[in-house]
Amino acid sequence: MIRGSSALKSLTSRRLYSTGVKYTTLSNGVTVATETNPAAKTSSVGLFFGAGSRSEHSHSNGISALTTNVLASQSAKGSLLTAKNDREFNGIIAQTTNDNITEAGKLIASIASNAVDIVEKTDLTKHKQYLSAQASAVEADPKSKVLSHLYSSAFQGYSLALPTLGTTESVENLENQDSLRHLAKHLVNNNTVIAASGNFDHDKLADAIEANLKIAEGVKPEIKPASFLGSEVRMRDDTLPKAYISIAVHGEGLNSPNYYLAKVAAAIYGDFYLHSTIAKFTSPKLASIVQEYNIVESYNHYSKSFSDTGIWGYYAEIADKFTVDDFTHFSLKEWNRLSISISEAEVARAKAQVKTALAKELANSFAVTSDIAEKVLLVGHRQSLREAFEKIDAIKVNDVKEWGKSKVWDRDIVISGTGLIEDLLDYNRNRNEMAMMRW
């Protein structure tokens, strides 16, 4: 085994930071990546492999999630097994106590080693019913529906556009042979990572996995780059109580040097919820505008990143169907400011919010384990929280303005909406809001 470490140069005990990610390459080529934290009350360990809906086509859409759900349904004494399904990877995570992490690691290794036998002996009927119910739930929830169709419209023609859990139609036709072909292609040593987080000994866990993991050799499948397409999808439904919309531009990928810059830019506009007790004290200028004219109930800006591309924009819920166009006008005109008149105070506040959000997202061993796996699989390494904070702190106002000029100003947008969207005017009307006369 080849052992290494990207640990922090010094442990900041006051904040109880983790010791950084430690890596071990097993004799079979699989990477074990762990982050230990002496303050952790529980531990998690997971098997992750690059796949997800991006590895599928329209006829096999859902096979990644179905296969992972089957593997995660095995009995697990002393551990809680959970399936993790994303657009670019899948995982089976065992949550357990710190003292039981070695046994959980053996369990994960056993599932990986016997994945083919597990799938061959499993009747997929109930699993397909469960996955179809999950896919239907996505379409039944307005927010999930809008964002799912936003990705599908933005990356249409590419596998990145496919729903993470498939559709009821595609799932119905999946068979055991589809899962076996999926495993043969994606569950291979160069496409697999064992990730873990908690309070345990890295070397003991790596040794336990080394002794129990048998996995096929294979190369990491190549992914076809996805192009962003300015477009729109409208799913008007007047039976719903509100308008649910999302507007976005082409964002940054996980591998982009501007990954954190995009997050700071999104945080400049932030979130707003009309019925919150702190609504009147929300800082961004857009929040003041929407309260003055009472044109939106809630919105949140986001920067969603995949391995090589991303989406940057907002999701909004509007109770008054006659103010949809008002909100899109004011929100997109605020985006114009990103490359013109963003202030030092706005950037400083946004940087603080991004750092807080990052720390909050990694508040438990399950979240840290998933984050380690995602970054190692899709980027090749994972930065520590300290390194991320240093990059965020280095962002200046001019950096944000330059990013706004190149990624937001007068750029194509993608629009997705459902509910009372009669007042969501045509694409060209909103596209023209992406710039303004300057002299």
Swiss-Prot record:
This is Cytochrome b-c1 complex reductase subunit, mitochondrial. It comes from Candida albicans (strain SC5314 / ATCC MYA-2876). It is found in: Mitochondrion inner membrane. Gene3D superfamilies: Metalloenzyme, LuxS/M16 peptidase-like. It comes from the Eukaryota. Residues 1-17 form a transit peptide. One of its GO terms (molecular function) is metal ion binding. Component of the ubiquinol-cytochrome c oxidoreductase (cytochrome b-c1 complex, complex III, CIII), a multisubunit enzyme composed of 10 subunits. The complex is composed of 3 respiratory subunits cytochrome b (COB), cytochrome c1 (CYT1) and Rieske protein (RIP1), 2 core protein subunits COR1 and QCR2, and 5 low-molecular weight protein subunits QCR6, QCR7, QCR8, QCR9 and QCR10. Its main location: mitochondrion. Component of the ubiquinol-cytochrome c oxidoreductase, a multisubunit transmembrane complex that is part of the mitochondrial electron transport chain which drives oxidative phosphorylation. The complex plays an important role in the uptake of multiple carbon sources present in different host niches. SUPFAM superfamilies: LuxS/MPP-like metallohydrolase.
